[in-house]
Amino acid sequence: MNIGFISLGTSQADLKTDSTSWGNYENNAWSITNANLKYSTDHGDNWTTATEKSNISKSGILLSTGADDSFSKMGIYDLAGNEWEWTLEYNSNPYNPCTHRGGRCYFSGSDRPADSRGSYFSTTETPVFRVALY
């Protein structure tokens, strides 16, 4: 049985130290390579798989959603981005031990990428939005 993206068989120790097998987190077990990239020559109407030697500077680069089956949990892709979200990962901050991931729509620089991590007060309130298509 699954609750969200976390299997009930996941141990508490794994939640605190290792998320390689169950989440889209910093120490995940998969990697993104050029084989996962695509490019478009017609402004996004059609996408072609890129290789290292492809000319991928024509009209944009796309990291394809669901580049392989390991990117999908329960058939849903790319649910991260444009807002912070709480994770089940722990960090070393004794006052805020839970970790959030992702950037905020009004942040810039190193705080913006979806793979950024941090800790913040759980009572922080900021309006955010996320567009989802499926």
Stretches with model-predicted labels:
Residues S64-F71, N93-Y134:
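Disulfide-stabilized, aromatic/cysteine-rich ligand-recognition loop
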Residues T17, Y25, L79, Y95, ...:
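Short, solvent-exposed loop/turn segments at the edges of secondary structure
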